[in-house]
Curated annotation (Swiss-Prot):
Similarity-based family: Belongs to the MurCDEF family.
GO terms assigned for molecular function: ATP binding; UDP-N-acetylmuramate-L-alanine ligase activity
Key word Acetylation present: no
Pfam name, any one: Mur_ligase
Matching NCBIfam families: murC
Disulfide bonds: none
Stored InterPro entries: Mur-like_cat_sf, Mur_ligase_C, Mur_ligase_C_dom_sf, Mur_ligase_cen, Mur_ligase_N, MurCDEF_pg_biosynth, UDP-N-AcMur_Ala_ligase_MurC
Protein name: UDP-N-acetylmuramate--L-alanine ligase
Gene Ontology biological process: cell division; cell wall organization; peptidoglycan biosynthetic process; regulation of cell shape
Entry keywords, A to Z: ATP-binding, Cell cycle, Cell division, Cell shape, Cell wall biogenesis/degradation, Cytoplasm, Ligase, Nucleotide-binding, Peptidoglycan synthesis
Residue numbers binding ATP: G112, T113, H114, G115, K116, T117, T118
C-alpha cells in the first residue's frame, strides 16, 4: 500500500526551480505549502493559485505535510528540515520530485552549462504551437505564458536538467538536449573537469534504448563525449556534420535570420527559413535544439517557423525594458537585463547586444555571483568585462558563501584598471546602482544590467524612477 501524499511543503518555494514544480503540483490537485525568506513574484503567484506561503523558516510550517521538498540551497540545519526529519516526514530533493513528475509523462530534459532556460522555453513554445500542449518547468518566466511552469494535457513534460549539483542524474527522460559543457560549479565535481564531462555521459545513459540525445556539436566538450554516448544521437549546430544545421545566420533589427538544413535517419527534410525573435548566435544554437526536438516529434514545419518568429522571450534573458529617459531629459537610453553570470554567457550576451545595437555605446552594470566563481574565472571575467565601453561593477553577490581574499569586486576593479581596457566604476552597495547608472549614461547608450543576484531588481527600479519623475 503506497503512503498517500496529499500535502507537499517546499522549503525555499520562491526559487526558480522550486516554484515551477510547486505550480505543476498545485494544478495536479495537491495541497501545496511553502516558505521562503521573502516575497517575490513567484511566491505571490503561488499564493494566488492557492498555495499557503509563509515568510521565514519555522518548524511549525511543516505541520500537516506528507512530504517536504528541498533544493540544494537549503541547509541540513534548516528548522523545517530538522522538524520534518524529527517527525519522519520524507525530505525529498527537488530533482527527485521533478523526476517523479517526469514519470507521469514523457520527459524532455534540457541540460548544459549555459542556455538551459532559453532552450527549454523554445522547446516548450514550439511543441505548444505544434498542438502537443506540453507540461513545462522552466528556470525563468516564459513571457508568453506569464509563468515558469504549466500543466499541459499532452504527453510530454519539458524541463531543465541541473548539472550544478549533479541532480540531473536523478532524471529518466526520453529525450535530452546538451547545449554545452563548461567549467562551472566545479566544487560539485572536485574541481575535476573530466568528472564533469563524465556526469554528462552518465546523463545520456539515463535514456531508454528508444531515447534520443540531441547534442550541440559546435561545443568542443560536447563533441569530446560523443564517442561515449551509446544512445541514438542527433547533432545540431553550425558544424558541417550537424544533422540540424544553421547556415547564412545574420542579425537583423535585434532578430536572427538563418536557414536550417535537416538530415535525419538518412532522409533530408525540407530546409526551413527561420526568423528568430531573439538576438545572438548562441540563441540560433538554442533554437536549433528546439527544431531538432520538434522535427523528431513531427511538429509541422509551419508551427516551428511561427513559434520561433513569435517567441516572446524569457524573463531576465536579454529582457528588453525599452527606452528610459536620461536624467537631464536630453534623450533616452535602451535598457536590457540579463541573468548571465559566467564569462562565457556574458560574452555571448554582450556580442548579441553589439549585434542588435551596432554603433552604440555599450554600458554594462554587472554584479558577480559567488566568490568561488569569481575566484575560479577571475581572468576570464577581466577579459570579458574589458570589452564594454563603460562598466559599473557591483560587489559580489555571495549566495551564502563566505568572502574569499582577492576574489571580490574591488579585486576585479583593480585588475581591470591594470588591464587598461575600461575604467570601471565600483558600486559597493547594490542599492546605489540605479543612481550610478543614471550618472553614467548618455543619450543613445545601450545599458545592460547583468548577474544572477539582486541586480535583477535594478531595471524595475530605473523604470519606476522614470515613471515617478513623469507624474
Amino acid at each position: 500500500m503506497k503512503h498517500i501524499v496529499k500535502n507537499i511543503h517546499f522549503v525555499g518555494i520562491g526559487g526558480a526551480g522550486m516554484s515551477g514544480i510547486a505550480e505543476v503540483l498545485l494544478n495536479l490537485g495537491y495541497k501545496v505549502s511553502g516558505s521562503d525568506v521573502g516575497s517575490n513574484a513567484a511566491t505571490r503567484r503561488l499564493a494566488s493559485l492557492g498555495a499557503r506561503v509563509a515568510h521565514g523558516h519555522d518548524a511549525e510550517n511543516v505541520t500537516g505535510a506528507n512530504a517536504v521538498v528541498v533544493s540544494t540551497a537549503v541547509t541540513n540545519d534548516n528548522p523545517e528540515v530538522l522538524a520534518a526529519r524529527a517527525r519522519r516526514i520524507p525530505v525529498v530533493p527537488r530533482a527527485v520530485m521533478l523526476a517523479e513528475l517526469m514519470r507521469l509523462k514523457q520527459g524532455v530534459a534540457i541540460a548544459g552549462t549555459h542556455g538551459k532556460t532559453t532552450t527549454t522555453s523554445l522547446v516548450a513554445s514550439v511543441l505548444a504551437e505544434g498542438g502537443l500542449d506540453p507540461t513545462f518547468v522552466i528556470g525563468g518566466r516564459l513571457n508568453s505564458a506569464g509563468a515558469n511552469a504549466r500543466l499541459g494535457t499532452g504527453d510530454f513534460i519539458v524541463a531543465e536538467a541541473d548539472e550544478s549539483d549533479a541532480s540531473f542524474l536523478n532524471l529518466f527522460p526520453v529525450m535530452e538536449v546538451i547545449t554545452n559543457i563548461d567549467a562551472d560549479h566545479m566544487d560539485t565535481y572536485g574541481h575535476d573537469f573530466a568528472r564533469l564531462k563524465q556526469a554528462f555521459v552518465e546523463f545520456t545513459q539515463r535514456l531508454p534504448f528508444y531515447g534520443i540525445a540531441v547534442l550541440c556539436v559546435d561545443d568542443p566538450n560536447v563533441r569530446e563525449i560523443l564517442p561515449f554516448v551509446s544512445k541514438p544521437v542527433v547533432r545540431y549546430g553550425f558544424a558541417e556534420d550537424a544533422q540540424i544545421r544553421a547556415v547564412n545566420a545574420r542579425a537583423v533589427d535585434g532578430q536572427m535570420h538563418f536557414t536550417v538544413l535537416r538530415q535525419l535517419n538518412g532522409h533530408a527534410e525540407p530546409p526551413l527559413d527561420i526568423v528568430l525573435n531573439l538576438p545572438g548566435i548562441h540563441n540560433v544554437q538554442n533554437a536549433l535544439a528546439a527544431i531538432a526536438i520538434a522535427t523528431e516529434l513531427e511538429v509541422p514545419d509551419a508551427s516551428i517557423v511561427k513559434a520561433l518568429r513569435e517567441f516572446h522571450g524569457v524573463g531576465r534573458r536579454f529582457q528588453r525594458y525599452g527606452e528610459v529617459a536620461t536624467p537631464d531629459g536630453s534623450g533616452t537610453f535602451t535598457l536590457v537585463d540579463d541573468y548571465g553570470h559566467h564569462p562565457v554567457e556574458m560574452a555571448a550576451t554582450l556580442a548579441a547586444a553589439r549585434g542588435a545595437f551596432p554603433d552604440r555605446r555599450l554600458v554594462l552594470a554587472f554584479q558577480p555571483h559567488r566568490f568561488t566563481r569569481t575566484r575560479d574565472c577571475f581572468e576570464d571575467f577581466v577579459k570579458v568585462l574589458g570589452t564594454v565601453d563603460a562598466l559599473l561593477l557591483a560587489e559580489v553577490y555571495a549566495a551564502g558563501e563566505s568572502p574569499i581574499v582577492a576574489a571580490d569586486g574591488r579585486a576585479l576593479t583593480r585588475a581591470l584598471r591594470v588591464a587598461n581596457k575600461v575604467e570601471p566604476v565600483f558600486v559597493e552597495q547594490i542599492e546605489d546602482m540605479p543612481q550610478a547608472i543614471l550618472n553614467a549614461v548618455r543619450p543613445g547608450d545601450v545599458v545592460v544590467t547583468m548577474g544572477a543576484g539582486s541586480i535583477g531588481a535594478v531595471p524595475g527600479q530605473l523604470v519606476s524612477h522614470q515613471q515617478g519623475g513623469q507624474q
